[in-house]
Amino acid sequence: MSLYQHMLVFYAVMAAIAFLITWFLSHDKKRIRFLSAFLVGATWPMSFPVALLFSLF
């Protein structure tokens, strides 16, 4: 596999992990939980640390 494919697999795995963690941290309706988990998973390098910080308070 090329470097690009390794990076793509890493991004997809981290997106899935961020999706699952965000899903279990949120306490809203299922639609809102799915939407927030999907958006955080898709943009995890910027939004996942923010979601973790918000879950602390």
Swiss-Prot record:
Could you tell me the membrane topology recorded for this protein?
Answer: Multi-pass membrane protein
Q: List, alphabetically, the GO terms of the cellular component aspect.
A: plasma membrane
Phenotype of gene-disrupted mutants: Strongly represses cell swarming but no effect on cell swimming. Increased metabolic activity in the presence of TMP, an inhibitor of dihydrofolate reductase (folA) and sulfamethoxazole, an inhibitor of dihydropteroate synthetase (folC). Cells grow faster than wild-type in the presence of TMP.
Q: Which InterPro entries match?
A: Toxin_GhoT/OrtT (IPR019689)
Per its record, what triggers expression of this gene product? By conditions that induce the stringent response such as increased expression of RelA, heat shock at 43 degrees Celsius, probably under control of sigma factor E and/or H (rpoE, rpoH), or growth in the presence of trimethoprim (TMP), mupirocin or serine hydroxamate.
- Give the record's GO biological process terms: autolysis
Effect the entry attributes to changing residue 1 to T? Not toxic as no protein is produced
Predominant cellular place of this UniProt entry's protein:
membrane
Transmembrane portions of the chain:
6-26, 34-54
Q: Which keywords has UniProt assigned to this entry? A: Cell inner membrane, Cell membrane, Membrane, Stress response, Transmembrane, Transmembrane helix
Q: tRNA processing as a keyword?
A: no
Keyword ATP-binding among UniProt keywords: no
| Compartments, as annotated in UniProt | Cell inner membrane
The UniProt entry's sequence similarity note says: Belongs to the GhoT/OrtT toxin family.
Q: Anything else of interest in the record?
A: Although this protein has high homology to GhoT, the toxic component of a type IV toxin-antitoxin system, no antitoxin has been found. GhoS (the antitoxin for GhoT), YdcY (the neighboring gene), 5'- and 3'-UTRs as well as approximately 620 bp lengths of the BW25113 genome DNA were tested.
Its function, per the record, reads:
Acts as an orphan toxin which is important for maintaining cell fitness during stress related to the stringent response (decreased amino acid, purine and thymidine availability). Overexpression inhibits cell growth and increases the formation of persister cells. Causes 99.9% of cells to undergo bacterial lysis within 2 hours after induction; nucleoids condense, the cytoplasm seems empty and the periplasmic space enlarges. The intracellular ATP level decreases about 27-fold suggesting the membrane potential may be disrupted.
Q: What is this protein called?
A: Orphan toxin OrtT
Organism field: Escherichia coli (strain K12)
Query: What's the encoding gene here?
Result: ortT
